[in-house]
Amino acid sequence: MSIVTEKDDPSLLGESNIAKKRPTKSRKKDPNRPRQSKPYNQRFRHGAGWPTIIWIGLIHLGALAAPFCFTWDGLIAAVFLYYLTGCVGVTLGLHRYLTHAGFKTYKPVRYALAFIGQLSGEGSALDWVATHRKHHAHSDQEDDPHSPEDGGWWAHIIWLAPHHTPAEKDELHMRWGPDLRKDRGMWFLHQTFILWHLVLGVALMGLGYYLGGWYTACSLVVWGMFLRLTVLLHVTWFVNSATHMWGYRNYETTDKSTNLWWVGLLAFGEGWHNNHHAYPRMAVHGHKWWEFDLTWNVLRVMRMCGLAWDIVDYKQKTKDGTVKV
């Protein structure tokens, strides 16, 4: 099944964000049409999205128990699952593959990446991809789902709080994620999003009990689920907020995307966000030698193993290290 990307539909990217061969001055915005931020009463016109609020709240509440049930087994579980669900699942699977089609792979790998990505707690693959494609189409404009132009806290977490009607959700899915919405496997994962977190939690508890009794079982659940999800959620949210507020820019796009080193490290290369907004389909986000991109190295290993091909890579670099197309 083909994947809808900005290559097929330019509105997924937005003409204003197509990078030039060399960095150029951003096109000026029309002074007669200032950006209009929607007031909160309009954003919450359908009320609060309590299922999402409760989901995020419970994750954070459970993470508070981490200092009281530390074990090395719990720490190992947290670090391993943070890498697996964050790097392999979110940045490689949901973002660079399913959203932007930065490479090709086998269908079983496609579903595996989507499944692992959903275990990040950030929503189903369908929700994640559709929202991110909409973000690229309207980056830092009125219809951007999470722009700091509407406030830093809005971009970081509050944007998740409003309730969206079934009709609004269906419109989001069909406009920005029709390839996933029409895929029965992806739709199944979408409908069973919570179930697989419960299964993982039970599996961690069983493993912990086997390794060291109930204390270790609680440790694996708290560290491997609640604390890991809390950290991963905020790191991903920093990509939405911090990398549109602070940092440096290699390319002059008309949004406010930036490169931020500490987000780059914590988010496995996603913090080189200005590079990504300049060339969204590129599977490599680090465009200068010091911009380390762990996800790109994972993809290189997949290519060597025959699990990835037709990778969208830069063709050459200019003398200053920026990408030339």
Question: What function would you assign to each model-found segment?
Answer:
Residues Y83, R96, S241, M245, ...:
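Catalytic glutamate of the conserved HExxH
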Residues M1-W237, M282-V325:
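Non-catalytic, topology-defining segments of multipass membrane proteins
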Residues C87, R96, E122, G264-N275:
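Pore-loop/selectivity-filter region of tetrameric P-loop cation channels
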Residues W176-G185, W246-W272, A278-Y279:
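Active-site-proximal inter-transmembrane loops
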Residues L232-N250:
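C-terminal accessory segments of proteins
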